[in-house]
Amino acid sequence: MSGRGKGGKAKAKAKSRSSRAGLQFPVGRIHRLLRKGNYAERVGAGAPVYLAAVLEYLAAEVLELAGNAARDNKKSRIIPRHLQLAIRNDEELNKLLSGVTIAQGGVLPNIQAVLLPKKTQKAAK
């Protein structure tokens, strides 16, 4: 007996479910919230991973468009106005967030065609 114990492998370093799935959003936290939220009696192992991926995709999409809106306005910081412009100018995001009011977002610039001044034809000589 050499006294080395059971010669098993060293315990592997813990790896989060988010990193296993290649996500930034917290899979463990979403799983906990799904369990505590009384949405269902049981929550499968894949559900929080899928939900985290969907939320991460939506956040990335909104931030991408808002960043473009900020750059168009020659600003380096995204403000609520940029989020509003990004969401309302995108057809699918606008449909998804149609019932959402963004504080300090303002409105989209829009002038009805009938209110615009009429173009007069100059007589050709």
Curated annotation (Swiss-Prot):
Keywords: Acetylation, Chromosome, DNA-binding, Methylation, Nucleosome core, Nucleus
Basic residues bias: start-end ranges: 1-18
Cellular component, GO annotation: nucleosome; nucleus
Region (Disordered): 1-21
Residues the record lists as N5-methylglutamine modifications: 104
UniProt xrefs under InterPro entries: Histone-fold, Histone_H2A, Histone_H2A/H2B/H3, Histone_H2A_C, Histone_H2A_CS
CDD domains: HFD_H2A
Signal peptide: none
Subcellular location(s) per record: Nucleus; Chromosome
Major subcellular location class: nucleus
Modified residues (N-acetylserine): 2
Record's keyword annotation contains Transcription regulation: no
Molecular function per GO: DNA binding; protein heterodimerization activity; structural constituent of chromatin
PANTHER family: HISTONE H2A
Record family assignment: Belongs to the histone H2A family.
Function: Core component of nucleosome. Nucleosomes wrap and compact DNA into chromatin, limiting DNA accessibility to the cellular machineries which require DNA as a template. Histones thereby play a central role in transcription regulation, DNA repair, DNA replication and chromosomal stability. DNA accessibility is regulated via a complex set of post-translational modifications of histones, also called histone code, and nucleosome remodeling.
Record's subunit section: The nucleosome is a histone octamer containing two molecules each of H2A, H2B, H3 and H4 assembled in one H3-H4 heterotetramer and two H2A-H2B heterodimers. The octamer wraps approximately 147 bp of DNA.
Protein name: Histone H2A
